[in-house]
Amino acid sequence: MNRPLAIAFTLLVASTAAQSQTQTQTLTQWNFNSVTPDASTATGSLLPNVGSGTATLVGTTGSFASGVGSTDPAAIDNSGWGTSGYATQGTGDRTRGVQFNVSTVGFNLIAVSWDQRLSNTAARSAQFQYSLNGTNFTDFGAVFSGSPGDTWFNNRSVDLSSVAGVGNNANFAFRVVAAFEPLTSAYAAATTSSTYATTGTWRFDQVSVTAVPEPGTYAMMLAGLAMIGFMALRRSR
């Protein structure tokens, strides 16, 4: 293969690779598994296994337990993030749960998904909330309802692509919090034959934020490739 043709082929491959980066990709993900596998689901990590971000508790206490039943493909050492210590019945609507902070700088068309397990006495309704400044949160969409308890509800998802300010935002954050049943002032237990209790638990796994690079990012990639091609052709003469 002559030099100009080799250069053209290389640029074509690089351009195809760059274009693939404009497709939806996982920006950040938490699988809550131990960074160093230890064959114990009672241990885990709040560090993302993909990308960067922080996971924190909102008025609850946390622990690690088995993630078996979620979409996590890990065959062993599959942990989930368990939470308990939810509000007394009739109080604290949408104030307790979990929070995740993820910078979306350079990305748009943001979407969030997660797997969630509810114990029998846990609140069956969960509200998704988002924040543009990491402090003030806004409800988004209807509550997620899950029944019966002791069950994983996988691939819960929200599409935030229509919300101005979510993309390209260093302070983007979101929460999943326990909610009263719609049009009531009380929590309902995940299993209808059970009674809601503050000791009920929620467990999370495979919390993921997906996004698409902004057009400007792709344009810079192509500009860089064009410059590489120009310099390579110049040297080949």
Q: Each PLM stretch: what is its role?
A:
Residues 106, 117-124:
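Extended, low-complexity, turn-rich repeat/linker tracts enriched in Gly/Pro/Ser/Thr and Asp/Glu
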Residues 104-113, 169:
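Extended extracellular/luminal ectodomain segments enriched in beta-structured repeat modules
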Residues 13-18:
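N-terminal signal peptide c-region/cleavage motif recognized by signal peptidases
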Residues 128-131:
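Conserved Ser/Thr-centered positions that define the repeating blades of beta-propeller domains
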Residues 54-105:
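Surface-exposed, low-complexity/disordered Ser/Thr/Gly/Pro/Asn-rich loops and linkers
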Residues 21-61:
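Extracellular carbohydrate-recognition regions
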Residues 25-36, 137-211:
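Terminal, low-complexity interaction segments
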Residues 214-233:
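A short, hydrophobic C-terminal helix/tail in secreted or cell-surface proteins
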